[in-house]
Each structure stands twice: as structure tokens, then as C-alpha cells.
Amino acid sequence: MNIPEIIHGIWLGGRIPLKLKNYRRSWKRYHRDWEFKLWTEDNLPELENQTLYDKAITYAEKSDVVRLEVLKEFGGVYADMDYSCIRNITPLIEDADFFIVQDGKIWKKNHPRYGIPYLNNAFIGCTPNHRLIKLLVDSLPGFALENKDYHVCFRTGPGFVSQMLKDEDILRLENWKIRRKYAKHHYENSWKDIEPQPRPWPED
């Protein structure tokens, strides 16, 4: 497999809820030989986009910064803490050097710029220093500034990766196909009380 057998998770602020710990354990159950890295405020690597991280209002935005940079440095698979695993994902990604989950066929209604595939950085992986992960790390500060008045989902999260990767030939794991066989996103949205989720939300 091209992508390193590493599964990254990020938790910033407070204790990890038991439900999320159980989701995390599900990955270990089906990937016993893989390395697991849980990034917290106590062990973050040196960040290229440290200024953006420091200025971020929400933990979601901070996490968006960190996930791209740890993937650039180490490679591997990043899964949000509210993703649970149903079986080993190797068959899904064994021939890929970059993948991302696709939540919907297109963005709808929310944003005039996003009539494009709805990609989600909640589940993403690559080889170290992959061209596209470098593109995302390099482009994030400018994009976030340009879209500073939009919701975090648009300025640093799914909206950002959707816009940057819309024309790239990459492996897109269709969420509606994998969620009953490999991995399920539970959409806990632990950050939504700080910055409420926008409505309407993109539809399939």
C-alpha cells in the first residue's frame, strides 16, 4: 500500500467524550497492525500555518489546519473523531496515493460558488508530501482570509477542499456507499455550539 498505515485523530479542548473514544477504538479493532496518532494541544507538531491556527476562533478551524499538516509530514489516514470503523479500509485505498471522502454529488443552495462535488476533509489520506496535500497547506491561509466572512465549513473545511480539489483526478470515496461497509460518519458536530451549522446544508 502506498499510503502509510497510520491513522491520525485530533482532539483539542477538554476531555474526549466516551462516545468518541468508542468510535476511535473501532479503528484499532480493525487495524491492529497500524500506528495510531492522537494529536492534542500537548503534542502538536510545528505548524507552517501557525498564525492561522492561533487566530482560529473554533476548534474545528484549528483542527482543519492541523490535519493537513500532519498528513503532509507523516502521510497516512485522517479520520474525524466521530467516524467509526466497520472493517479494515485497506481494500478501499490500497492503490491510492491520495483520497478524500465525497459527501454529496454537488453542493446545493448554501453557497453560489459551490455547484461542485461536495468533498469532506473529515476522512482524507495521502502519502507524505503529496503534491495535493502541499497545495492544500499552501493555499489555506489565503483562502481562509478571502472567505473570512463565511462559516468555518466553507473557509477552512469541506468548502475549501471542495474548491481546491474539484478538478483533480483523485480517489473519491462516496460516503453513501462506504458508510455501511467500511466507515460511518456520525456527524456529532461537537463544535456547532460555538459556530452553528449553516442551513440549508448540502444535499445528496
Predicted regions and their residues:
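Glycosyltransferase-associated regions of secretory-pathway enzymes
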Residues: 1-64, 79-204
